[in-house]
């Protein structure tokens, strides 16, 4: 293992390519059809609002096609379905494809290639217990701390300020960004990326009342992050009381998500920013939980469930359902309730109007009765 802080270019990273591409070249790369000037040259990419004349940009669908009018971009990737609309923009060159965003990102990766991975080796300014085992081609940056009996696989990246507690296991190709903390005995499988300032394996929020005070409940379990998981910055995942808190293969977790003790997250889930899962929540596969959703303890979300933003989930949701609202309910039902709620002011006015009309009718009936009374015969 290397023992220096010298930075040398490694074997990973994108190959060097020309910094300019023509319209024809881009069309060939993405398999699209070019309409306009095939010789137009671009040197960078940007979103449609900020793009300049030398930037490639894209529009994803018909409803956004009008944004082209105020853009300075001269070369724009668009879906095949908007072909008939392009006659209004004859001063631009277009590349027609089936998936504009995918094609745009393909070119972006070429014009803005990832930085080559530096070979730092094992920095002499890192603090590493002698019992730790670190695989080949792994970088441990200055000021990282690695505890007793830690095992780290090959080609990992341990950035500055990372703390890996005693007994942790990291597989191959794990990337821990700066200031991430793994408490003791956490298990991270292969191809996992954890962004800056995450905390994995802290005790859950568990207390019991003893002698009038809140006494902490020890957590003896751990956290297992399965392979091909990405976790956003500032996310926290608590260890289990016993057993494992589990994050399934292929799951993507956004920034600032909180996952409580003993949760079991299925495969290929998407958890968006500021989601909070209480203890022992479980999910199936391909579940999507939108931003700022709260899920109560022991709730299960079935396969393919989608939960809309800012929902509060208090009961299990069967697979394949889309829920939102607080308390969360089926989309169709909650949509009807919201539609009725929006009509409530008009309904209130209508009821008041009917009350006035009814009162007028009552008065009229009373007057008619009084008029119809005949004096008794002499």
Regions found by a protein language model. Give the residues of each.
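Structural signal for interior beta-strand "rungs" in well-ordered beta-sheet cores
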Residues: 58, 121-330
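Terminal amphipathic alpha-helical/low-complexity segments used for targeting or macromolecular assembly
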Residues: 1-125, 191, 197-198, 202-216, ...
């Amino acid at each position: 293992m290397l023992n220096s802080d010298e930075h040398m270019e490694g074997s990973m990273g994108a190959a060097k390519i020309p910094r300019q591409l023509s319209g024809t070249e881009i069309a060939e790369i993405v398999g699209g059809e070019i309409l306009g000037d095939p010789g137009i040259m671009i040197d960078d990419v940007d979103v449609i609002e900020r793009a300049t004349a030398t930037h490639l940009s894209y529009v994803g669908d018909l409803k956004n096609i009008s944004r082209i009018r105020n853009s300075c971009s001269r070369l724009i990737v668009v879906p095949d379905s908007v072909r008939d609309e392009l006659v209004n923009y004859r001063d631009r060159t277009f590349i027609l494809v089936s998936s504009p965003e995918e094609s745009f990102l393909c070119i972006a990766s070429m014009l803005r290639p990832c930085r080559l991975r530096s070979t730092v080796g094992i920095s002499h300014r890192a603090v590493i217990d002698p019992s730790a085992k670190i695989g080949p081609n792994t970088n441990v940056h200055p000021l990282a701390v690695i505890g007793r009996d830690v095992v780290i696989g090959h080609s990992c990246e341990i950035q500055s300020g990372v703390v890996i507690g005693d007994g942790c296991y990291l597989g191959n190709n794990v990337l821990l960004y700066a200031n991430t903390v793994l408490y003791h005995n956490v298990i991270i499988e292969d191809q996992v990326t954890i962004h800056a300032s995450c905390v994995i394996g802290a005790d859950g929020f568990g207390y019991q009342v003893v002698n009038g005070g809140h006494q902490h409940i020890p957590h003896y379990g751990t956290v297992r992050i399965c392979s091909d998981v990405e976790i956003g910055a500032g996310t926290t995942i608590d260890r289990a009381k016993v057993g494992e808190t589990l994050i399934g293969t292929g799951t993507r977790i956004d920034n600032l998500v909180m996952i409580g003790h003993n949760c079991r997250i299925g495969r290929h889930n998407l958890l968006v920013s500021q989601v909070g899962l209480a203890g022992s929540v479980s999910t199936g596969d391909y579940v999507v939980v939108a931003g700022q959703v709260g899920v109560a303890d022991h709730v299960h979300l079935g396969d393919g469930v989608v939960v809309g933003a800012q929902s509060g989930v208090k009961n299990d949701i069967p697979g394949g359902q889309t829920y939102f609202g607080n308390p969360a309910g089926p989309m169709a039902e909650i949509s009807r309730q919201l539609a009725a709620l929006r009509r409530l002011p008009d309904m209130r006015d209508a009821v008041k109007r009917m009350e006035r009309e009814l009162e007028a009718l009552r008065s009229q009936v009373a007057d008619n009765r009084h008029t119809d009374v005949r004096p008794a015969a002499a």
